[in-house]
A protein has these predicted regions:
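Rossmann-like S-adenosyl-L-methionine
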Residues: 81-167
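Acidic/glycine-enriched edge-of-secondary-structure segments
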Residues: 1-11
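Flexible, active-site-proximal loop/turn residues at the rims of small-molecule/cofactor binding pockets
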Residues: 35, 66, 152
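Generic alpha-helical secondary structure
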Residues: 3, 40-48, 156
Length: 167
């Protein structure tokens, strides 16, 4: 489907390598870091609209490197300006600005496990809380008392949103 959309846009040709994978949730598709880079690709709205349409998304972003002492996201918005996303995972809603906060999709089992190992009466200290990867499941599913520590102001905003959204 993506290849067909690119061929339609470029007169039957594919001017460069297409991504073989991407992440899709809500109304956004996130492409790998190296996708659609280089002189062969005209990086303008018609390209991004075609890619988003082929992937069934309204917004399109491209992964970047996590950097800095705050571990800030390097995600770049390609289509759409609103970078706020909500992911629901194991009954927990995580909201964050994807161009400013990272989300570690690979820790899904640990996030779920935190809701299983924490229980009412437990006191948990989450020293690197981020957007609430472990804090929120410990509260939502475990009922523990959690002291969450985070120094990235954008992650703190997202964590506060998650606390409100998850009750």
């Amino acid at each position: 489907m993506l290849e067909d959309a690119i061929k339609d846009l470029f007169g039957g040709m594919v001017p460069g390598e297409l991504p073989r994978r991407w992440e899709r949730f809500s109304d956004v598709a996130i492409l790998p870091h190296g996708s659609f880079r280089g002189d062969a690709w005209a990086s303008d709205d018609p390209l991004w609209e075609a890619v988003a349409g082929a992937l069934g998304a309204k917004r399109l972003a491209r992964m970047g490197e996590v950097s800095g002492e705050f571990r800030e996201s390097g995600v770049e918005m390609l289509l759409g300006e609103d970078d706020w996303v909500v992911r629901r995972e194991s009954g927990v809603d995580y909201g964050y600005a994807m161009t400013r906060c990272m989300f570690s999709a690979g820790n899904v089992n640990e996030r779920r496990r935190m809701g299983e190992v924490a229980s009412e009466g437990d006191v948990v200290v989450d020293l690197y809380a981020g957007i609430g990867y472990y804090t929120l499941p410990a509260l939502v599913h475990g009922g523990a008392t959690v002291h969450a520590c985070e120094w990235n102001p954008e992650a703190v905003k997202a964590l506060r949103w998650g606390l409100d959204a998850n009750g």
